[in-house]
């Protein structure tokens, strides 16, 4: 199932439009990775902003095929399982909702982040360290419906850089960098 753009997708696109131009000035050859590319909306935003080195992955075969048809390099991967190399920007609009037995199996993979909603995010952050350049940034979406993640405990500095209130939840994007030892 290809995850279709929704409020969280539009929030991420807005943040990319705010942040990427400044990062490109510092490094015109920066490498961009999206985990969970879905419909390719963020890949298209990255391309429009002038990023040349765009890579992506998704666990869903249909999403991978769709993004490849759009002209992007996309591989099938469960988080970083099949990813090689380091990246200056890594973005992730993860499945972040707590498990709900009423949700159809067909959509759970795209929306459910585990029993508490944060398990996939934690797994992502544990693996991302091995692929984030020393000065790199992660842009990550979270939801108030999921249990909070202790970013510092996972080795990251975190700054909330954008939020949107919906009638039932608050979506936020965090900019994460490696904690300097």
Q: What do the predicted segments below correspond to?
A:
Residues 2-19, 37-43, 49, 59-66, ...:
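S-adenosylmethionine
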Residues 28-38:
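Conserved class I S-adenosyl-L-methionine
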Residues 21-23:
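Membrane-interface junctions at the ends of membrane-embedded or membrane-associated helices
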Residues 25-29, 134:
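Short helix-terminating capping/connector loops at secondary-structure junctions
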């Amino acid at each position: 199932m290809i995850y279709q753009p929704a409020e969280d997708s539009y929030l991420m696109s807005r943040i990319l439009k705010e942040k990427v131009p400044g990062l490109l000035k510092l490094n015109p050859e920066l490498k961009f990775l999206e985990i969970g590319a879905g419909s390719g909306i963020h890949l298209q935003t990255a391309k429009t902003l002038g990023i040349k080195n765009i890579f992506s992955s998704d666990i869903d075969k249909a999403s991978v095929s769709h993004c490849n048809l759009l002209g992007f390099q996309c591989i099938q991967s469960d988080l970083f399982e099949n990813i090689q190399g380091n990246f200056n920007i890594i973005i992730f609009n993860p499945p972040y909702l707590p498990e709900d037995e009423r949700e159809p199996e067909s959509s759970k993979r795209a929306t459910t982040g585990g029993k508490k909603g944060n398990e996939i995010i934690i797994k992502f952050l544990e693996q991302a360290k091995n692929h984030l350049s020393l000065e790199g940034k992660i842009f990550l979406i979270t939801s108030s419906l999921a249990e909070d993640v202790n970013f510092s405990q996972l080795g990251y500095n975190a700054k909330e850089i954008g939020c949107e209130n919906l009638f039932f939840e608050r979506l936020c994007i965090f900019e994460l960098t490696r904690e300097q030892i």
